[in-house]
Amino acid sequence: MKYNVYLEDVSVEAVFNKLGGVGGAKRFLADELLLVEAPKPEAPPEPVLDFLVRVDRAVKPSYPDWFKKLENPELECSGPAEYDLQTAVQQWLASGQESVIKGDRIYAQLKKDNALASCLNLQDGLAIQQKGIAVFRKLFAGKAVFLWGSVVQNRLGLLSVPCLFEYGDEVVVGWGWLGSNWSSLDPALRFSK
C-alpha cells in the first residue's frame, strides 16, 4: 500500500514503514507499541585544560633582532617558577584604559605605582604560549595581553612591550610600541596579591 500524503515535509509512508507496516500500525493503535523519543546525543565533554604554568627562571628569553636593551633588567628572570594562570594572574587596566590611551601612559602609571614587579614578563609569556590556544581562549579570548615586566628599547630608542594574542589557532608573541593606542582589550597581566 502506498500513501502519497505529506505532512510538513514528512511522508506518511515513511512513518507507516517506521512503525513496521500494517502490523506495527495496528499494534501502535492498540497501545501495544509505544514510541519513545530517542535520547539526544550528549555533547562531548570539554577537554580538561591545564592552567599550571611552569617557568624556568634560569633561562633568559630570546629577543627580536631589533632589540637594544631591557628597560628593567632586574625583572627579566623574576617571578614565581610555578603558578595557576586562573587564580594567580589578573588582567589589569590602567586608569583611562576603558577607552583608549597611549602605552606610554600605562607604563608611566605602572612605574609611578611601583607595580612593574607584579607584571608578567616575556618568560611568562613564552610559558603561557606553550599552554596552547584552548587555555588562552578560555582566559583571554579576543584580547592581546601585555607583559609589562619586559619593556625593551629598540635601536632607535623607542620602547616596546611584548604581548600574546591569538592568530588563527595559535598563540603568538607580538610587540606593542608604547606610542600606540591601548584599549580595554589590551590588559596587562599581573600577579594577584
Language-model features, listed with the residues they occupy:
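A binding-site-centric feature that preferentially detects glycan-recognition modules on secreted/surface proteins
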Residues: 1-118, 123-193
